[in-house]
């Protein structure tokens, strides 16, 4: 076990309070001499002292830790974002606690409560709960919250998102402009605002092109076991509407599964 504040204080014949102030960076503010501060720091190094971060956060109200909640840690999209967030956090002197919600509301809410109990200084989250109740309570409590990828209409938290409706509208309009007329949509988590907006963009693009939104060309995939579900959904659509000539996937995870089982098909990819 490493040395404690008491060990350092006894060795230097100082009070624990003085040692604590120096090690927490408050030496100058508390009027402690430069010589005493140097002695404390040197002693801490020689005794391999490691601060109790939880105790420090309780005393100062600052943990220098940010909680990050992702829908999926294994998803390359979110993994890349986590990597960039961690780099920026480290640049500012913060460490990151990362957890995955599996896009499950109950798990997400439990993680929010867990991070709060760990006294994190803020939480960054791609929310799974479309109601935003727990995130809303978090924001109201005064804890800094930033949403990304998925916004919540009833929450005042800061949010970083793209224009999902405009993006999907442009993509489907591009397919229609190339002459494709029976464009299917494959989606997941339809309750999420992000997916609702992408579906809305799809429907708007079809209407703009004078195309009928055929319900047979709609596929909804459960995330659990999505690999098989994507193939089953494609089978069902192609069996029902054999002349389907285009597919719009609302997320890259679904899109990357299609070529695996359908390399023999000639379908638009741009």
Residue ranges of predicted features:
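Short, Asp-centered acidic motifs that coordinate Mg2+ and/or phosphate
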Residues: 122-123, 246
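N-terminal helix-turn-helix/winged-helix DNA-binding helices
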Residues: 1-4, 45-77, 81-83, 91-94, ...
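N-terminal helix-turn-helix DNA-binding module of bacterial transcription factors
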Residues: 1-62
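Structural motif
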Residues: 69, 99, 125-126, 186, ...
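Short beta-strand segments enriched in small/hydrophobic residues
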Residues: 18-21, 59-72, 183-189
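Bacterial carbohydrate/catabolite-sensing allosteric modules
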Residues: 46, 87-92, 116, 139-147, ...
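Short beta-strand elements of ligand-binding domains
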Residues: 98-101, 124-127, 142-152
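Short beta->alpha connector loops
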Residues: 102-105, 126-131, 252-254
């Amino acid at each position: 076990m490493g040395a404690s504040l008491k060990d350092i204080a006894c060795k230097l014949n100082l009070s624990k309070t003085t040692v604590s102030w120096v090690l927490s960076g408050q030496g100058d503010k508390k009027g402690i001499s430069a010589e005493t501060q140097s002695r404390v720091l040197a002693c801490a190094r020689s005794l391999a002292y490691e601060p109790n971060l939880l105790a420090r956060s309780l005393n100062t109200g600052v943990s220098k830790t940010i909680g990050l909640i992702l829908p999926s840690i294994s998803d390359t999209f979110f993994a890349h974002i986590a990597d960039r967030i961690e780099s920026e956090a480290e640049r500012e002197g913060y460490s990151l606690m990362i957890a995955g919600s599996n896009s499950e509301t109950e798990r997400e809410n439990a993680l929010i409560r867990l991070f709060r109990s760990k006294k994190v200084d803020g939480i960054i989250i791609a929310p799974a709960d479309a109601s935003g109740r727990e995130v809303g309570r978090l924001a109201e409590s005064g804890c800094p919250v930033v949403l990304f990828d998925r916004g919540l209409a009833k929450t005042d938290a800061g949010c970083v998102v793209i224009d999902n409706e405009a993006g999907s509208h442009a993509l489907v309009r591009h397919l229609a402009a190339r002459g494709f007329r029976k464009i299917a949509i494959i989606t997941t988590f339809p309750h999420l605002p992000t997916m609702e907006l992408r579906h809305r963009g799809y429907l708007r693009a079809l209407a703009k092109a004078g195309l009928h939104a055929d319900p047979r060309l709609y596929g909804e995939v459960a995330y659990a076991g999505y690999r098989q579900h994507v193939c089953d959904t494609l089978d069902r659509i192609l069996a029902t509407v054999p002349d389907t000539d285009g597919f719009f996937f609302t997320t890259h995870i679904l899109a990357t599964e299609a070529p695996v089982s359908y390399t023999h098909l000639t379908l638009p990819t741009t």
